[in-house]
Amino acid sequence: MFSKFKAKDKVIVNGIGKCNGKEYINQTAIVINRDPFFLDYNVRFEDGTEDWLEEECLRKFKGE
């Protein structure tokens, strides 16, 4: 199946994480990988924390 985001892509996160229910608003993160069964993404934030999010919560980072 097609992955919208590849590993090491920089993304902007707007949504609620699945690990601890934290809400992220306009946070930048790096995609680590995609779960092939649940089809959600594991991302690492700038502070080093990681969380799982659905594809709808992510969009490509433009800039830099």
For each of these PLM feature ranges, what is it?
Residues 2-64:
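Basic/aromatic-rich interaction segments and small domains that mediate binding to polyanionic partners
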